[in-house]
């Protein structure tokens, strides 16, 4: 399907997004003007995402939003997690940072939702062998707020452990920054490990450094005190 025709990153900028999966029809309004402005700003920040007005919303977006009962507008962003060459985890994380920076500059507040399962191998002889130990260890690092731990996984490890969809997680991690999740859940199955993380606590203020920078108006005083002390 369309999932195999994506560039690294694609934004939906049409007025609405529709789709269907397993008999369930999906429909959400899309803030196209915001989407186009976001594309422009991402270009200026060194990213070249594609954009579409007609792409269908599949289960990866439709199911999570349906379970959440979301009925407001949605700005779908598609990530090529499947077809090599895929974007690196570093690039996905930086893309998330650029999205957050752009939306903040635009004065837009939003909820970030990333969809992608942990280890699974659909269509292969490893379908019944999800990597539970790997998933558990990876999730433990995220539970501690170490979202940058995702950057340590290269394309070989992601492919070998069936975790190619963590590229979507890396995009969300870049947008969120280093934060401990409020909710962490892991639900293993015989063919696919499901995990969920959620953040709803406001970002804490940045703590003062033990060695703060010198305020410009205090340079002369600081220099004099240093000379007296030595």
Give the predicted meaning of each segment.
Residues 1-4:
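Short, small-residue-biased leader/transition segments that mark boundaries at the very start
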Residues 16-54:
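Acidic, low-complexity central loop/insert segments
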Residues 52-106:
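Glycine-rich phosphate- or other oxyanion-binding loops that anchor nucleotides, phosphorylated ligands
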Residues 87-134:
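Active-site beta-strand/loop microenvironment that shapes enzyme catalytic pockets
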Residues 126-150:
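Gly/Ser/Thr-rich active-site loops/lids in small-molecule metabolic enzymes
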Residues 141-186:
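Polyanion-binding loop/helix "lid" in catalytic or ligand-binding cores
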Residues 178-212:
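Long, Lys/Arg- and hydrophobic-enriched amphipathic alpha-helices
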Residues 213-229:
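Short, basic/aromatic recognition patches
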């Amino acid at each position: 399907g369309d999932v195999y025709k994506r560039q690294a990153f694609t934004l939906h900028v049409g007025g609405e997004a529709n789709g269907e999966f397993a008999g369930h029809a999906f429909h959400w309004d899309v803030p196209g003007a915001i989407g186009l402005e976001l594309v422009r700003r991402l270009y200026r920040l060194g990213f070249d995402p594609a954009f579409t007005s007609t792409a269908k919303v599949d289960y990866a977006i439709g199911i999570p939003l349906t379970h959440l009962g979301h009925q407001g507008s949605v700005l779908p962003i598609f990530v090529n997690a499947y077809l090599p060459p895929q974007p690196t985890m570093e690039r996905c994380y930086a893309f998330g940072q650029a999205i957050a920076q752009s939306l903040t500059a635009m004065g837009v507040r939003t909820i970030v939702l990333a969809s992608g399962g942990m280890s699974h191998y659909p269509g292969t002889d490893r379908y019944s062998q999800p990597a539970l130990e790997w998933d558990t260890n990876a999730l433990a690092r995220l539970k501690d707020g170490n979202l940058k731990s995702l950057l340590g996984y290269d394309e070989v490890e992601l492919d070998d452990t069936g975790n190619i969809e963590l590229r979507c997680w890396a995009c969300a991690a870049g947008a969120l920054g280093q934060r401990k999740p409020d909710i962490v859940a892991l639900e293993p199955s015989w063919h696919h490990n499901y995990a969920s993380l959620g953040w709803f606590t406001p970002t804490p203020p940045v703590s003062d450094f033990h060695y703060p920078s010198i305020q410009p108006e205090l340079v002369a005083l600081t220099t004099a005190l240093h000379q007296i002390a030595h």
